[in-house]
Amino acid sequence: MIESIIYNVAVMVAGIYLFHRLQYSENKIMVFSKGYVTVLMTIVALLLAAYPIPFHQEYLVHLTFVPLLFLGRFTNMGYTLVSAVIVALVEVFAFGNSLLYGVVLIVIGIIVSMVGPFLKQNDIVALVILNLISVIILLILSIFSPLYDLTEIAFLVPISFVLTIASAITFVDMWHFFSLVTRYENEDKYDYLTGLGNVKEFDRHLNHVSQIAEDKNESLALLLIDIDGFKDVNDTYSHKSGDAVLKQMSQLLKNYVPKQFQIFRNGGEEFSVVIRNYSLDQSVKLAENIRTGVEKSSFHLPNKEVIKLSVSIGVGYLSQDDHKSQRKVFKDADDMVHVAKNEGRNQVMFNPIIKL
């Protein structure tokens, strides 16, 4: 029995390690996706099905439902249900388990996938809650089915919780570790908080786009977007609230900026958008759409409060006939941001100075 318990725990931990190792391998052969997680966890479930835990030489305790908890938490109902059906069919037709148990696996898959993504607790607690739900389902089964009894369920409860907690701790710990590795690898290009390009990448990109615009005789525009009163958010509510605002602001910008243009967080509360081959009118209209969108939006803080914000936007613009100077377009946009701030904030300004 001890060997079986060790095997079950080892299979789950090894599966979780393999999940992270392939995802973060140097060659990046495997790309993270819900389908990839489903395949891996289905294989883990089948390995658990092949080696159930014997109890008193009378019972065989199956822990094949535990990988379904991870799928219910980290994927969706479609993926979880596919995995549950595959595991149930193998349990019934390959390993001779009862048809009723196969149905229960599918029911567990459906329920945990309905509940898992919406649990507000951290991942470890959420997985323990999903395990408790699964045990309750099996307990109900033992009451109404002669194939299972309370003794088997009583043994299943501590074993399943040990497996779930050990697997969850391993999963979260490795996730945090490899997330730090990814952050270190990407810190030269990306802002870790918003996922947007950082100021270093902004400089490289602006220089590159400026050269293309010069070579192709195209216009070049730059929007510098500054959140009004952002310091007050940090001072009044906390830096955690400020981070939440920055994340929401980055998502809002993604919704308004056309896909062909890149968005950057230059640092602090300043964002930028590099635009090529747009007219001045188009560039200013885009800036005004962003300003209006922010003004109409509500920003949700971690303490459940909702606040309103505004942005000041400076537009730097070089026409087709202008020499595409990276420094000039940045200076023009930066000067216009300061003018917008001095003119009362929540405005779009560009040169020649026109207020919208």
From Swiss-Prot:
NCBIfam families, alphabetized: GGDEF
Originating organism: Staphylococcus haemolyticus (strain JCSC1435)
GO molecular function: diguanylate cyclase activity; phosphorelay sensor kinase activity
Its membrane topology: Multi-pass membrane protein
Highest taxon in the source lineage: Bacteria
UniProt KW Transmembrane helix keyword: yes
UniProt entry tagged with the keyword Membrane: yes
Keyword terms: Cell membrane, Membrane, Transmembrane, Transmembrane helix
Compartments it resides in: Cell membrane
One annotated GO biological process: cell adhesion involved in single-species biofilm formation
Protein name per Swiss-Prot or TrEMBL: Uncharacterized membrane protein SH2145
Chief localisation class: membrane
Matches recorded under InterPro entries: Diguanylate_Cyclase (IPR050469), GGDEF_dom (IPR000160), Nucleotide_cyclase (IPR029787), Rev_trsase/Diguanyl_cyclase (IPR043128), Sig_transdc_His_kinase_LytS_TM (IPR011620)
SMART domains: GGDEF (SM00267)
Transmembrane segments annotated in the record for this chain: 2-22, 35-55, 76-96, 99-119, 124-144, 152-172
Gene Ontology CC terms, in alphabetical order: plasma membrane
Domain GGDEF: 218-353
